[in-house]
Swiss-Prot record:
Pfam family membership, one: ABC_tran
Name the UniProt record assigns to this protein: High-affinity branched-chain amino acid transport ATP-binding protein LivF
Gene3D superfamilies: P-loop containing nucleotide triphosphate hydrolases
ABC transporter domain boundaries: 6-237
GO annotation terms (biological process): L-amino acid transport
InterPro entries linked to this entry: AAA+_ATPase, ABC_branched_ATPase_LivF/BraG, ABC_transporter-like_ATP-bd, ABC_transporter-like_CS, BCAA_Transport_ATP-bd_LivF, P-loop_NTPase
Protein source organism: Salmonella typhimurium (strain LT2 / SGSC1412 / ATCC 700720)
Classification of source organism: Bacteria, Pseudomonadati, Pseudomonadota, Gammaproteobacteria, Enterobacterales
Family assignment from sequence similarity: Belongs to the ABC transporter superfamily.
Function: Component of the high-affinity branched-chain amino acid transport system.
Positions bound to ATP: 38-45
Amino acid sequence: MEKTMLTFEKVSAHYGKIQALHDVSLHINQGEIVTLIGANGAGKTTLLGTLCGDPRASSGRVVFDGKDITDWQTAKIMREAVAIVPEGRRVFSRMTVEENLAMGGFFAERDRFQERIKWVYELFPRLHERRIQRAGTMSGGEQQMLAIGRALMSQPRLLLLDEPSLGLAPIIIQQIFDTIEQLREQGMTIFLVEQNANQALKLADRGYVLENGHVVLSDTGDALLANEAVRSAYLGG
């Protein structure tokens, strides 16, 4: 029997008087990649925000590993082995690559820290090559690798990725998605929010389509790729 890792149960959210999410329900099973696709302004990043408490859900529940975390503080949620790679990367630009990774592994024991950083360097050899370089001088693709690596330093059970392909060259996008596939093969549970619907659905076990704050469709990744409405709206026909 599949174990459910994360559930959004009829989650609504507001920015002031504007309702951004309307009774959104979805779930992610352990070991899955689940993707959420939708146009700009559909509410994808807002839904991720309700998991981390920004914004808080105005109604409904967010449940992680059987625990209702709807009203938890962000720091407490992160201690539950949840890590997020935010849209726009947000690396510490004046710190070196290795210092950025150290921030991600701040709570790790020293032996565990060395093990994690070695693993991240194996996933992203370029980070090892540039480990003493300041993050702000790196390319967008390298910064995205660093943002993912930093999140992985906390040894998460659930990894949240918000638009990891945004603004990147096609060859770098493929490298990022290849790494996401590797993480799934190693048993990590991944919630992928992505505008690049074609790449995301090829990778995903299951997917959801969000429009104007409503889930309008859900199915396997392959089925959504073949869906005529999805192809017309998000895959260029």
